[in-house]
């Protein structure tokens, strides 16, 4: 037996145990078992072409060599994906801990209290940041969440709208393009007409059941949507807002200016970009939609001894109960990512989140001031972290110099581009950006130091957040690594995971991902790659996808 092969380490039964099991059920071999259980018309006649098996050691050498092909440049593309700083205590104790990553969907509350509390933290985070009364425990990503919200609005139309066959969903042309594509795909099969355009010129007719806007929009501009919301409400149309979660530490939350549903991604809360995933989409809405909303909802109850306990609430929406009539499928919840995002908020607390958001905004302010001195025109009157610019020279000139300095911007057209700042950006990074932009227009730039970072918000008063958030005890207790580590362990031991026992439920998710397979996930050659990076920077990802 090859002791280091994946097969011998990853598949539990030994050869003699396999033979004993086969004898018990009356078949001579695994091939015979497959032939008897798989219909002949769908059974492959030849083995899959998957190449020669590797040992775990050989695989790690192979994947390391492959990873080196990717180019991990400093990326300021934005578009819903931003570099973050994952706290080491979360990486070590959740992401790389089988006590968290092997646990099964918490149908059985009595062996899931740890994860249920972690997911409740996530729900609380989302409800607090958006100021919506109800949030679920995550979806796949922002685009999926937006499409689910559209469908929820469609199913929740008033009787009058249903009678009139209202089927139009208005979508601002300023939402992220990947979100729009998913919305169009999901709308097609439901005969929903997606109308894309300038939200300020939308006509709310009796056929319009809902509308969607982005906050801040895909170009980075922070807009006042109050008049738009008034028009929609007058027509009894429902409002969907796709919001940047980190920006809501500084901006007035959508729940305070009329949103019926708020969606987005929690990726900014400590999750790596990872070429676009996995992330955890969030979904928050008014209580009117609680029986129509998708995703798991964690609720507080009491156990048989009268003590506080947690369970999944409103499960009658789910596929395991309603089957084909279900309004929710919780399989695509990205629960581990939601847990990590929630714990990012627990670890930093309100003060930490506010500090991170403010620092991002202040660095963007510096960039905004300096680029205009170099002759670039900046379009966004108000912004959080993204600037959209018109260049005095063609963007291919800027791109050439930027690539020489291993920097990626978002190039929109031949003379327009955008830059998004994130949690990992430093004043040194701002200097590097400005030196690229100065060189492109044949000017010089004198480097700035940390004293240039200001404290003033360049956001109008009516768009600044006034309400408090994350005041709950859980977000104001575990701010040292020791406290956080103990809290995570306390939750972990309340659960039953594959590192302790077999889980008494069967599912497609019951397969253990080997440590060797998961090990490269956090390598920067994979974790820091933007999904819209140039293709010549991601050959390793493209090879993996092709294979």
Regions found by a protein language model. Name each.
Residues 1-13, 17-21:
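Charged, compositionally biased N-terminal leader segments and the immediate start
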Residues 13, 38-121, 321, 461-546:
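N-terminal entrance/gating region of PLP-dependent enzymes' catalytic architecture
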Residues 84-99, 104-209, 511-547:
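PLP-dependent aspartate aminotransferase-fold enzymes
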Residues 105-109, 131-137, 165-170, 210-214, ...:
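Glycine- and acidic
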Residues 144-309, 371, 375, 384, ...:
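Conserved PLP-enzyme active-site core in the AAT-like
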Residues 200-201, 308, 444-468:
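Long, charged amphipathic helices and adjacent flexible linkers at domain junctions
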Residues 269-370, 374, 379-381:
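Active-site C-terminal subdomain of aminotransferase-like
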Residues 351-454, 485, 491-493, 503-505:
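Conserved C-terminal alpha-helix-loop-beta "cap" of PLP-dependent enzymes
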């Amino acid at each position: 037996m090859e002791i280091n092969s994946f097969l011998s380490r990853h598949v539990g039964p030994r050869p003699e145990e396999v033979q004993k099991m086969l004898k018990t059920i009356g078949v001579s071999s695994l091939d015979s078992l497959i032939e008897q259980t798989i219909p002949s018309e769908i059974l492959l006649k030849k083995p899959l072409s998957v190449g020669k098996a590797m040992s775990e050691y050989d695989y790690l050498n192979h994947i390391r060599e492959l990873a080196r092909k990717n180019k991990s440049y400093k990326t300021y593309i934005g578009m819903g994906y931003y570099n973050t700083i994952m706290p080491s205590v979360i990486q070590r104790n959740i992401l790389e801990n089988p006590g968290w990553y092997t646990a099964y969907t918490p149908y059985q509350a009595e062996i899931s209290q740890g994860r249920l509390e972690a997911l409740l933290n996530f729900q609380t985070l989302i409800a607090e940041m958006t100021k919506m009364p109800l949030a679920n425990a995550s979806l796949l990503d922002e685009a999926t969440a937006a499409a689910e919200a559209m469908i929820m609005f469609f199913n929740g139309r008033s009787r009058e709208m249903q009678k009139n066959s209202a089927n139009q969903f208005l979508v601002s042309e300023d939402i992220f393009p990947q979100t729009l594509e998913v919305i169009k795909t999901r709308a097609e099969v439901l005969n929903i007409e997606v109308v894309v355009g300038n939200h300020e010129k939308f006509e709310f007719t009796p056929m319009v059941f809902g509308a969607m806007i982005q906050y801040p929009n895909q170009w980075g501009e922070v807009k006042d949507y109050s008049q738009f919301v008034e028009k929609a409400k007058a027509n009894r149309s429902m409002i969907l807002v796709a919001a940047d979660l980190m920006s809501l530490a500084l901006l007035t939350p959508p729940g305070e200016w009329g949103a019926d549903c708020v969606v987005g991604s929690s990726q900014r809360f400590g999750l790596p970009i990872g070429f676009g995933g996995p992330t955890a989409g969030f979904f928050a809405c008014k209580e009117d939609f609680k029986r129509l909303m998708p995703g798991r909802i964690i609720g507080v109850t009491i156990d048989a001894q009268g003590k506080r306990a947690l369970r999944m609430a409103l499960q009658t929406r789910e596929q395991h109960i309603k089957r084909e009539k279900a309004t929710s499928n919780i399989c695509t919840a990205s629960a581990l990512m939601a847990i990590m995002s929630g714990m990012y908020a627990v670890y930093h607390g309100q003060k930490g989140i506010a500090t991170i958001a403010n620092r991002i905004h202040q660095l963007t302010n510096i960039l905004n001031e300096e680029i205009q001195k170099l002759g670039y025109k900046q379009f966004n009157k108000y912004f959080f972290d993204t600037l959209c610019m018109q260049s005095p020279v063609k963007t291919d000139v800027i791109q050439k110099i930027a690539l020489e300095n291993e920097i990626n911007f978002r190039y929109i057209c031949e003379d327009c581009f955008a830059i998004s700042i994130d949690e990992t950006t430093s004043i040194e990074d701002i200097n590097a950006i400005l030196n690229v932009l100065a060189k492109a227009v044949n000017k010089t730039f004198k480097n700035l130091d940390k004293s240039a970072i200001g404290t003033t918000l360049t956001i109008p008063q009516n768009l600044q957040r006034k309400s408090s958030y994350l005041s709950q005890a859980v977000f104001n207790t575990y701010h040292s690594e020791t406290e956080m580590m103990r809290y995570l362990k306390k939750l972990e031991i309340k659960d039953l995971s594959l590192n302790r026992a077999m889980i008494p439920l069967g599912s497609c998710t019951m397969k253990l991902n080997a440590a060797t397979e998961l090990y490269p996930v956090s390598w920067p050659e994979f974790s820091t790659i933007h999904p819209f990076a140039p293709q010549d920077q991601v050959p390793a990802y493209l090879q993996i996808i092709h294979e």
